[in-house]
Amino acid sequence: MWIVLAFVLTVAAPAYAQRATVRKPPPAPAPTAPIKAAPEMTCPTPLGVGVTTKQTFCDVMAGRDPAAGILIKLPPHKGPVTLTFDLHNRHTYSEEQTKANRAYARYTATIGVLAMDNTLISRAVVQNEFRKARDLVDRIGGGAGPGGVKAVAPTGDEPITITIPEEEGEVSILGEKLAVDRIDGSATYSSPGRPIAVISNVMIEYRPPPPKPVRKRK
C-alpha cells in the first residue's frame, strides 16, 4: 500500500507543475508611424517666391559658422531623420545676352549639411548648364524687371536626400564653393557671405518618440 501511494505522489507532482500559469512578458509597443512635414526653418537670405511654382526659394551662403547658415530645427524623434530638398544653381538672367547667344554658363555648386558643432554630416552638389530661358526653374517675384520679376533665378534641379543622425536636434546648411564656366572664362567662388546655391521644397521625415508609460495610481 505504501509503495502504490508513493508512486501516485511521484507521478502527480510533474502534472501539477505543468498546470502552473506562466506569465508572458507584455508585447513591445508598436513603432510609431513616420511623419513627413515641412520643418521649422530659418532662412537668413530669402531669394523669394516662384511666380509659377509658388515655392519659396532660399539662398545658400558660403560660410564656416553653422549658426549663420540655413537652420533646420528637428522635432523630437526616435531614430535618424531624413532631410530632403531641391538644390539649384543661381543665374542672373539677361534677355539681351540670351538673344545674342552669349548667356551660356555651366554651374557647379557644392554645399554642406552640418551639425551645430560644425561636424559635416553630408555634402550635396548640383551641376547644370544654362542656355535659354527654359533652363530656369522659375522666375522670382518682387523684382524691378519686366513683369515684376528679379533678374536672379534658380536654374538646375537636383533632388537631395540626407540622413540626419538621431542625436541631432538642429542642422545647418552652408555653401562651400561655386564653379562657373562662361564664354569669357571660368571662376570659382568660396568667400564667406557669397551666395553659392539655392534650395527649395525642404521636408523632413521622422518617427516621433514612443509615448511615455502612464504610471498607475496606487
Language-model-detected regions and their locations in the chain:
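Surface-exposed edge beta-strand/loop patches
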Residues: K177-K218
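Short coil-to-beta strand junction motifs in C2/discoidin
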Residues: E96-A109, S191-P192
